[in-house]
């Protein structure tokens, strides 16, 4: 009995470690909205079902075929300690961009998870029989191996409770919004650029109005409800709501909650193609925002985006088109001048013969689109051109989104939070306009569904045809398409460096640098990379 109790204690430690990881992945995959968590399990089946857990299959076979109960207990304890050791060391090597947030929902899931795991243990302790040890360990071993699937089960079991909690917060948010009759809502959606556009529009409108925006990447129903219930106040003139989605109908759900009067679509691309299913569904979903606006509302659309130009809008609200290449729009930017300090450009409005000069600290065409959205909406809301010019000049770069920083004497163009094809292309444009030696550090693009190989290979071709002198690829398997794209375009193989650990990129960058060097940090690089920059950077 003593050995069994010890094995239970060690088992509970193992379950805690593995369950925390499973809950983290469930949270990252939006609690299985659009079956994202199920798809993650399938994609990572080696971690979720195989790998070192296979050792337990050996143990289970051994325990069934022997009657050596004490030895079975010792084997079970040793295997648990070994798996805990492997698990902890594996996690140390990984650095999550977003750590597990211990929200109320996660705590409720943890409670259900604890109950589910304690029930069989309590039954075993009450009905303890040494002859049944093999059966006990068989049950516990299977529960450990299937932990990610058990997490899926507890998410399902908690669904009625979460629906009740959601309805409570929703009603509270709706009542608060209905009481704020002097405040209008601005919705922002798109395949990418939502957070950057939200920040830019906020900074521009804030020069005249009291504007509140959703914090960080709060772009789900719960995120908006929390923002409304805990942060909005009666003095806000405008509330900017970032709207994210991974399946059709989710933008409409957000619009039904906050009733936006104004809407901005950034760009429509391949982000979350895996969960949407098709590019057409992505297009229709993003336009749920524009089609939810009232007849006296205003939509701001990108005239350089074919997906937006080709869509048949089912709404008679006012539409303002912005662009850079398309000069038939209502508001376009021209004469872009890029330096390491930022961008200068001119803006032309339809019906106005003058070109108006603007200056910003932001880099890249994507950021000019974001600024144009803010300028166009700000002008409609009565902000003078002089104030718009001042506001644009004051806009601060968003960290990890084409922001400039330093690592010793290396100039870093930090685009580590970008993960889309158009953004990658524009980031390379920014790099190519800088003086000195150029490097790219990237682990490649993810969450672009079945086109992941294709878009990463194209990214490799684009790097090869840019002014990039050295390429550092992080991860052998994920970056293989980029490597193939580089080689296909006859990029020198000696200039391609493939690393398994992102931390090895730092000494390599220092080794490869020249007197003046610019390094583009592109795509979903882990937080460890950003932490290394912050701790080591010298000014």
Residue ranges of each PLM-predicted region?
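Buried hydrophobic packing segments
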Residues: 201, 205, 224-228, 371-381, ...
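Walker A (P-loop) phosphate-binding motif
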Residues: 171-217
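Switch II (G3) loop of P-loop NTPases
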Residues: 236-251, 412-418
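N-terminal pre-Walker A segment at the start of P-loop NTPase domains
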Residues: 154-172
């Amino acid at each position: 009995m003593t050995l069994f109790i010890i094995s239970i204690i060690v088992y509970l430690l193992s379950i805690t470690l593995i369950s925390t990881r499973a809950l983290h992945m469930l949270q990252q995959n939006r609690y299985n909205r659009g079956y994202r968590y199920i798809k993650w399990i399938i994609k990572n089946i080696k971690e979720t079902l195989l790998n070192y857990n296979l050792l337990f299959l050996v143990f289970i076979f051994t325990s069934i075929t022997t009657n050596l109960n004490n030895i079975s207990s010792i084997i079970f304890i040793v295997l648990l300690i070994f798996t805990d050791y492997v698990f902890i060391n594996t996690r140390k090597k990984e650095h999550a961009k977003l750590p597990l947030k211990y929200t109320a929902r996660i705590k409720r899931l943890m409670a259900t998870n604890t109950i589910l795991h304690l029930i069989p243990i309590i039954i075993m302790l009450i009905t303890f029989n040494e002859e049944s040890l093999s059966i006990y360990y068989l049950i516990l071993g299977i529960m450990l191996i299937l932990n990610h699937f058990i997490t899926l089960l507890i998410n399902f079991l908690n669904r009625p409770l979460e629906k009740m909690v959601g309805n409570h917060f929703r009603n509270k948010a709706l009542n608060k919004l209905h009481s704020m009759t002097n405040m209008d809502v601005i919705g922002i959606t798109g395949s990418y650029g939502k957070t950057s556009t939200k920040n830019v529009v906020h900074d521009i409108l804030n020069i005249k109005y009291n504007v509140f925006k959703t914090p960080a990447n709060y772009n789900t129903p719960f995120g908006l409800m929390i923002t409304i219930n805990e942060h909005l106040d009666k003095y806000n003139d405008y509330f900017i709501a970032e709207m994210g989605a991974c399946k059709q109908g989710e933008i409409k759900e957000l619009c039904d909650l906050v009733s936006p009067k104004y809407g901005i679509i950034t760009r429509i691309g391949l982000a979350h193609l895996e969960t949407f299913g098709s590019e057409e569904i992505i297009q229709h979903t993003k336009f749920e925002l524009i089609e939810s606006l009232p007849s006296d509302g205003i939509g701001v659309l990108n005239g350089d985006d074919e997906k937006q130009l080709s869509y048949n809008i089912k709404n008679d609200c006012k539409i303002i088109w912005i662009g850079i290449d398309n000069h038939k729009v209502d508001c376009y930017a021209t004469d872009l001048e890029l330096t390491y300090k930022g961008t200068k450009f001119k803006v032309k409005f339809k019906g106005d013969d003058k070109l108006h000069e603007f200056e910003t600290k932001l880099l890249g065409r994507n950021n000019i689109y974001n600024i144009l959205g803010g300028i166009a909406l700000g002008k409609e809301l009565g902000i003078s051109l002089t104030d718009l010019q001042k506001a644009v000049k004051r806009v601060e770069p968003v960290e990890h989104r084409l922001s400039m920083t330093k690592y010793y004497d290396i100039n870093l163009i930090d685009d580590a939070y970008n993960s889309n094809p158009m953004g990658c292309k524009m980031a390379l444009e920014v790099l190519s306009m800088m003086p000195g030696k150029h490097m790219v550090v990237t682990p490649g693009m993810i969450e672009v569904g079945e086109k992941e190989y294709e878009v990463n290979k194209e990214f490799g071709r684009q790097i090869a045809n840019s002014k990039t002198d050295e390429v550092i690829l992080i991860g052998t398997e994920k970056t293989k398409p980029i490597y193939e794209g580089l080689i296909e375009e006859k990029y020198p193989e000696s200039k391609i460096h493939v690393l398994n650990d992102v931390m090895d990129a730092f000494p390599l960058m220092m080794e490869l640098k020249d007197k003046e060097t610019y390094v583009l940090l592109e795509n979903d690089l882990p937080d460890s990379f950003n932490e290394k920059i912050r701790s080591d950077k010298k000014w």
